[in-house]
């Protein structure tokens, strides 16, 4: 049972690539004022992250018997996206239509939901023995 598994690292690496590509595309489309395409790539970006998390998370669930209700994936996404977005602004790669404040507000709200997810994780963890659900052990 590994907290930082190969599947989680694969997800983090793919997420970083997706985020950088998304940021490049977002900046270019915002600069060109192509609002429709901004929405399209945003939805595609979110969908791609969801599918990647679903696939790597399911595979991890089969290989690594840890019951965390997806918290590790949520936390990894929060950290990778936050660092990539902050770095994007610190390096001056953002569009004039992008604001660091939007990143900070997103991280603040997301952090609140992440905290709630952590509480859920702790509650579910009480129902497990060393990360394995009790019903999986005693059936």
Where do the protein language model's features map onto the residues?
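Loop-to-transmembrane helix junctions at the membrane interface
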Residues: 52-79
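C-terminal halves and exits of single transmembrane alpha-helices
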Residues: 72-101
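Generic alpha-helical transmembrane segments
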Residues: 35-56, 109-113
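Juxtamembrane "helix-exit" motif on the non-cytosolic side of transmembrane helices
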Residues: 20-32, 58, 85-96
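Non-cytosolic membrane-interface motifs at loop->transmembrane helix junctions
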Residues: 32-40, 66, 96-107
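Alpha-helical transmembrane segments of integral membrane proteins, especially early/N-terminal helices
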Residues: 1-13, 35-41
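Alpha-helical membrane-associated segments of multi-pass integral membrane proteins
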Residues: 14, 93-137
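Alpha-helical transmembrane segments
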Residues: 7-19, 80, 113
């Amino acid at each position: 049972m590994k907290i930082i598994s190969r599947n989680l690292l694969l997800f983090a690496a793919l997420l970083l690539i997706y985020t950088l590509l998304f940021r490049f595309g977002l900046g270019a489309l915002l600069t060109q004022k192509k609002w429709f395409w901004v929405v399209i790539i945003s939805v595609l970006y979110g969908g791609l992250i969801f599918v990647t998390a679903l696939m790597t998370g399911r595979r991890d669930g089969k290989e690594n018997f840890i019951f965390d209700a997806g918290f590790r994936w949520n936390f990894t996404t929060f950290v990778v996206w936050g660092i990539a977005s902050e770095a994007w602004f610190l390096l001056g790669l953002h569009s004039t239509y992008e604001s660091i404040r939007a990143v900070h507000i997103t991280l603040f709200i997301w952090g609140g939901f992440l905290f709630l997810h952590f509480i859920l994780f702790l509650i579910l963890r009480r129902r497990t023995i060393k990360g394995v659900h009790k019903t999986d052990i005693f059936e």
